[in-house]
Amino acid sequence: MAGFVLKNTLSDNGGVTRGICKMNEDYNLTEVVETKNIVKTAAGAEAEGMAVDVDSLVSMNMWGLTPDFLTTLEEGFKEFFEKEVPGNPLKAEYLIPIFIGELLEHGKMSVKVLKTNDTWYGMTYHEDVAAVKDSFKRMLENGVYKTDLFSDL
């Protein structure tokens, strides 16, 4: 799983939800703590009035999973559908990070966190659009991406 540095995923325009990664010394994921309304501050970041380490690694749901995981996912979905959907058929959500967290908790899966210092270009707020467009324009100008990115498809 790609572990983004929190400060590289925050919006200048308001709070965001991020899955803060807890890991052992070998960067094996032990838990993802969903943290809501993380906002930039002069000192770094905070959520619900508590400081949050801006150098924490966070999950942006960029998982690298093996084909065998699809079988496990399907089995988990059947259980989810039987238990969760009847009580809340319109809003029940099968969230992969929560499912993976349960597998980690029961020792049925391991996930290596691979740190990336890249920036996450998210559009949580309408006001984020201009900054994202500007960032992609600069990447095109700097040759990070070619202008005709999809021409060979």
Describe each region flagged by the PLM.
Residues 74-109:
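A C-terminal functional module that forms or caps the active site or interfaces directly
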Residues 1-63, 67:
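Conserved core of the sugar-phosphate nucleotidyltransferase
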Residues 67-68, 127:
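Alpha-helix/helix-capping structural signal
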Residues 32, 72-73, 132:
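Residues that scaffold the ATP/ADP-binding catalytic core of kinase and kinase-like folds
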Residues 107-110, 118-153:
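Hydrophobic helical membrane-anchoring modules
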Residues 63, 86-90, 122:
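Hydrophobic alpha-helical scaffolding
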Residues 45-51, 101-116:
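Glycine-rich loop/turn
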